[in-house]
Design a protein with these regions (language model features):
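Short, acidic loop-to-helix structural element flanking the phosphoryl-transfer center
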Residues: 76-106, 112, 116, 139-140
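Conserved SAM-binding loop
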Residues: 8, 104, 158
Length: 206
C-alpha cells in the first residue's frame, strides 16, 4: 500500500506552494501556521489542515462555505503541477515490477475523486488494485484494504513519507517502509532499494 505525494510522485513541494497561495491574503502568520501543520502532518486531508488554521488563527471553526472555497482554490492551484510531477526515484520501476508479484494499492490524503482523476489521466490506475483517498483517514484506508481482502496485517506493507502513514501502519499492525528519515524504521531517501528490502524480509513460517 503506497501513499501518493512524496512516495509515488514528487508532488509535495507542489502542494506546499499551493497551500501558501490559497491563504497568502490572510497574512504571513496564516501562511506559517498552515505550512508548519502541512509539513508535520503529511497524509492529512487538506480540509483538516484548513480547519487547524482557523482554530489557531481565529480561535473558531471554519464555516463550510469558506472551507469548500479554499479546497477548490487549492485543487486548482496544484492540479497541473501534480500532473507534471516526476516519479520519486525508484517508484515507477518498483510499481511495474511489484504489480507482477503482489496486489498494489494507493492510500492518499488527497480527495478520492481528484486522486483517481490524476491517476486516470496519467495512465496509472491500471497498475493498482485500488486507488483510495480522503475523506477517509489514512488509518481507515489501510485498515479497510486489509479487511476487505482478508490480508494478514503482518504481511502487509505501508510505504509512506509521513508520521500519518507510520501511525496508520502501527494502528493496522502492518509493516512500514519510509521515504525519508524515520528513526527505528526501515527507510531510505527514495524507493530505489524498496524491492531489495521486501525480498530480504523473512518468508512466512521461517
Amino acid at each position: 500500500v503506497l501513499d501518493c505525494d512524496g512516495v509515488i510522485l514528487e508532488s509535495v513541494d507542489v502542494k506546499t506552494r499551493a497551500f501558501a497561495s490559497t491563504v497568502k491574503r490572510l497574512g504571513p502568520q496564516a501562511v506559517e501556521i498552515l505550512l508548519d501543520y502541512h509539513r508535520s502532518h503529511g497524509g492529512v486531508s487538506r480540509f483538516e489542515k484548513y480547519r487547524h488554521l482557523w482554530r489557531e488563527l481565529y480561535g473558531r471553526e471554519i464555516d463550510e462555505q469558506t472551507l469548500a472555497r479554499l479546497g477548490e482554490a487549492f485543487a486548482a492551484a496544484c492540479f497541473e503541477g501534480v500532473m507534471r510531477a516526476p516519479f520519486v526515484p525508484g517508484a515507477e520501476a518498483f510499481i511495474l515490477a511489484a504489480r507482477e508479484r503482489w496486489p498494489l494499492y494507493v492510500a492518499s490524503g488527497t480527495p478520492e475523486d481528484e486522486l483517481r482523476q490524476i491517476f486516470d489521466t496519467r495512465g496509472l490506475t491500471g497498475l493498482f488494485q485500488g486507488v483510495y483517498g480522503s475523506p477517509r483517514t489514512k488509518a481507515d484506508l489501510l485498515a479497510g484494504i486489509i479487511a476487505e481482502h482478508d490480508y494478514a496485517p503482518s504481511r502487509t506493507l505501508m510505504v509512506g513519507d509521513s508520521v500519518t502513514d507510520l501511525a496508520a501502519a502501527r494502528a493496522a499492525g502492518s509493516m512500514f517502509y519510509g521515504r525519508g528519515e524515520f528513526p527505528d524504521q526501515p527507510s531510505a531517501a527514495d524507493l530505489t532499494g524498496l524491492m531489495d528490502f521486501i525480498d530480504g524480509l523473512p518468508c512466512p513460517g521461517s
